[in-house]
Swiss-Prot record:
Belongs to the class-II aminoacyl-tRNA synthetase family. Type 1 subfamily. Keywords: Aminoacyl-tRNA synthetase, ATP-binding, Cytoplasm, Ligase, Nucleotide-binding, Protein biosynthesis. This is Aspartate--tRNA ligase. L-aspartate binds at residues 174, 220, 448, 489. It catalyses: tRNA(Asp) + L-aspartate + ATP = L-aspartyl-tRNA(Asp) + AMP + diphosphate.
């Protein structure tokens, strides 16, 4: 139906006859001449219709051109010629196609929005097929496609084996809720959609496949936000006979090569490394954005004897923290703006936010200064590095809570004050805690997942020091986004059973849920480790968008709906009966 793509018609084709196909981007009837911007996936070319006196064919072509509306689908035949008025804004701006025939392949109904408009997100998702025609959306989807293609080429060339793992599998606790699928042939029993291929890829290592990868679809029934979806795509990888640095060095080289190939970005020749403890202490986050130079400063030692009870209590608590954040030039903040910062911190658990301003002349303005002697407060500000014109925020409370809300303030201040440097800041975060204590459940939970190996090999040591145990987990972070997470796995059945026990998973429960894994580890499992990268998140970073929905062809809303297909939707009683499911009426 076509000999060339619209966006690739150029000066080398001048004088030649071409056949094009695409959508009517714009049609302009100027009376004696019609101009059509014809668009396909490669871009736009101008089609010109000039009726010649006494020429029945050109008159018919003009009549067709004059009838066109937005997004009509056309086939155009014509001769390429140089444009009198060059359009430098498009790739084909030096040429035009003089139409000798126009065939309307399909008429478009009146549009809810035009390809060059940017309506509300619900409208975009309802008419996703129209939204995806927009050049910006085409660009972002192509970025994702190029990313996946480049990853496959890179791994295939290095002897990784692309192996599929089951989509219908066993429900296992991996953090979020499972999506459950009723098993028609086994009444009352259910499959689960995989949250990740974690256990299968470990078993593939036991099976001797050495290097595995998969572009895997994963499913988690969790609350949605800009960087989360119910179903998502990850690059899943696993290596046999490796230590942490073996995995990290390989994938660091891979990510560096992929960014260069896909978006022509040169990442650092060596990614910095930082322990989890250092990241939390300096940045209040386990995924710090190193483009922002601001850092948290611990001040507990300086406030232990202060008369401000909030500070003194946290400073004298072994699990407490008092931290300060200096914002250069922040003394310009109004009281309302400071209240906005306090409200932002409250979203992350802050019960209050203290501050101190230093005017350009060095005058201190702070509601907490009265709890300190003049010299003591001056020493506190000096320890933080405060200078004239700055504001210093203080947070006090439990260590993790203070780290969370002060880290959130750091990000907000960095953006508000234009302190986010241009470029890319990758790093590795390592040495995560093995466990964290769940106050509500009154038990330990795994910080990564229960198959992550501890840094110690001795089970008695792990049991005795579970509270402070460090894992062999690692995350790759880019511009404040966790783009990949992995670990060295537990390959000994006795260690895996011990970790289950520390997590409150008894032997009987472990056998019921993970018996197949424990059995596999008993038959000569090699030391192994791996990592998984979020394809959606990396594609969004490459495409320059804050929402992964922009790089997913058919995403769900934050309300977990597909507005285009109207999913989820009720199921007929007959279908429910076939899978032995009965739906309880909603409670009034």
């Amino acid at each position: 139906m076509r000999t060339h793509f619209c966006g690739l018609v150029d000066e080398t084709l001048i004088g030649q006859t071409v056949t094009l196909a695409g959508w009517t981007d714009v049609a302009r009837n100027l009376g004696g001449v019609c101009f059509i911007d014809l668009r396909d996936h490669e871009g736009i070319v101008q089609v010109t219709v000039e009726p010649a006196e006494g020429d029945a064919n050109s008159a018919e072509v003009f009549k067709v051109a004059a009838s066109l509306g937005y997004e009509d689908v056309l086939q155009v035949e014509g001769v390429v010629r140089a444009r009198h008025a060059v359009n430098d804004k498009i790739r084909t701006g030096k040429v035009e196609v003089i139409a000798t025939r126009i065939t309307i392949l399909n008429k478009a109904a009146p549009l809810p929005f035009h390809a060059h408009e940017n309506p509300g997100e619900d409208t975009r998702l309802k008419y996703r097929y129209l939204d995806l025609r927009r050049p910006e959306m085409q660009r972002m989807q192509r970025t994702r496609i190029k990313l996946v293609q480049a990853l496959r080429r890179h791994l295939d060339a290095r002897d990784f084996q692309d192996i599929e793992t089951p989509i219908l599998t066993k429900a296992t606790p991996e953090g979020a809720r499972d999506f459950l699928v009723p098993a028609r042939m086994h009444p009352g029993e259910f499959y689960a959609l995989p949250q990740s291929p974690q256990l299968f890829k470990q078993i593939l290592m036991v099976a001797g496949f050495d290097r595995y990868y998969q572009i895997a679809r994963c499913f988690r029934d969790e609350a949605l936000r800009a960087d989360r979806q119910l179903e998502f795509t990850q690059l899943d990888m696993e290596f046999a006979f490796v230590r942490e640095r073996d995995v990290q060095d390989f994938v660091e080289d891979m990510i560096r090569a992929i960014f260069k190939e896909v978006v022509d970005v040169e990442l650092a020749a060596q990614f910095p490394r930082m322990t989890w403890a250092e990241a939390m202490r300096r940045y209040g986050s386990d995924k710090p954005d190193l483009r922002i130079a601001l850092e948290l400063v611990d001040v507990a030692e300086l406030v232990k004897t202060s008369e401000f009870p909030v500070f003194a209590a946290a400073a004298n608590d072994a699990d407490g923290r008092v931290a300060a954040l200096r914002i250069p030039g922040g003394a310009t903040l109004s009281r309302k703006q400071i209240d906005d910062y306090a409200a932002h911190a409250a979203k992350y658990g802050a019960k209050g936010l203290a501050y101190s301003k230093l005017s350009e002349t060095g005058e201190v303005s702070s509601p907490i200064a009265k709890f300190f002697g003049e010299e003591a407060f001056a020493a506190l500000l000096a320890h933080v590095g405060a200078a004239n014109g700055d504001i210093v925020f203080f947070g006090a409370g439990s260590y993790n809570k203070v780290s969370d809300f002060m880290g959130a303030l750091r990000l907000k201040a960095g953006k508000d004050f234009g302190l986010v440097a241009a470029g890319w800041a990758p790093l590795w975060v390592t040495d995560f805690p093995m466990f964290e204590w769940d106050e509500e459940a009154q038990r330990y939970v795994a910080l990564h997942h229960p198959f992550t190996a501890p840094a110690v090999d001795d089970i008695a040591d792990l049991r005795a020091n579970a509270r402070t145990a460090v894992s062999r987990g690692y995350d790759m972070v880019l511009n404040g986004n966790e783009i990949g997470g992995g670990s060295i796995r537990i390959h000994r059945p006795d260690m895996q059973s011990a970790v289950f026990e520390l997590l409150g998973i008894g032997a009987e429960e472990a056998r019921a849920k993970f018996g197949f894994l424990l059995d596999a580890l008993n038959y000569g499992a090699p030391p192994h480790g791996g990592i998984a990268f979020g394809i959606d998140r990396i594609a969004a970073l490459m495409a320059g968008t804050e929402s992964i929905r922009d790089v997913i062809p058919f995403p769900k809303t934050t309300g977990a709906q597909d507005l285009m297909t109207d999913a989820p939707s009720p199921i007929a009683a007959e279908q429910l009966a076939e899978v032995h499911v009965q739906v309880r009426p909603k409670q009034a």
